[in-house]
């Protein structure tokens, strides 16, 4: 997996298909993720794959929880979060039932050697669980890496004890703080890319914290920041600070998100386009009218640059959506790209996983088809998205 990432452009970003969690009928799979350190990252992977994330449990949604959560396993209604990681790693949609959490799964595993002894088989697994150290699962590893990324204030934090004691108190895993520290230092440090997690100091705010730690190690290594943060709200405030402090970094991430969405196998792919948020007040020209556009007009439109007030307004809207849905910048910009920069459609998509008009979201393959000079392909797109949405997509791509 690491070798495949070396061939890509960004090992820290999602690389799986944008339709991984889209059903054959074009509808998006809906997921509910229980609060955990990995929730934000899982949400990013799900949304990048075309799925949707519910803020509360909804009918028809796939309920996700980390293995070892007593309430989730007792109900039998939850699917392991490992399902998302495995789907992303293999880049294919796997069978849900194979990842269902429940007391029966542990009992079946422990009683395979003695299928006939019900009374003895039911009693034996419990002593075996506590006879030695509890094995680390992939979900545990993700929780550790995510917790370090979101709570470590300096490189020296991971070698101290305060960080790990705080993680043990949070009850995110069943392991002691000594085991958590040992697991990270000996097996996980530097392996973030294998779990599709970036290194901690990747954002401007993280860089600022790192510089502050070098200037004042004692203040950076204090336990106070850990006490002020909660696992249910990972880095929300830090994302806001990052955008406010460095708008250039935001613009760069917008371009990166665009490139990620627009990347195709052919060499004739068009130049990167910026996100233009529109309220859809005016109806765009139809595909037929658009085809009559003069070349000179197209060149003039391409040469137009976005003004600073427009950039500021776009950043403000994106920040509001990030705060409203508790998502990262890349996920929100991807949603805008998939909805042709339409604010209303993007908001509806982030809230419910569907556009308000009932049409599907745009994928990279749809954009490739849109570039083809083929009447049948264009008619198929009009049938799929509606003539007005196709016209809006054409206008959006020009910008």
Swiss-Prot record:
Residues 112-125 have a biased composition (Low complexity). One of its GO terms (molecular function) is phosphatase binding. It comes from Homo sapiens (Human). It holds the Pfam family BRCT_2. GO terms for biological process: intracellular signal transduction; negative regulation of DNA recombination at telomere; negative regulation of protein phosphorylation; negative regulation of telomere maintenance; positive regulation of canonical NF-kappaB signal transduction; positive regulation of NF-kappaB transcription factor activity; positive regulation of non-canonical NF-kappaB signal transduction; positive regulation of telomere maintenance. Residues 104-132, 196-244, 264-311 are annotated as: Disordered. This is Telomeric repeat-binding factor 2-interacting protein 1. A motif (Nuclear localization signal) lies at residues 383-399. Transmembrane segments: none annotated. Residues 128-188 form the Myb-like domain. Residues 280-304 have a biased composition (Acidic residues).
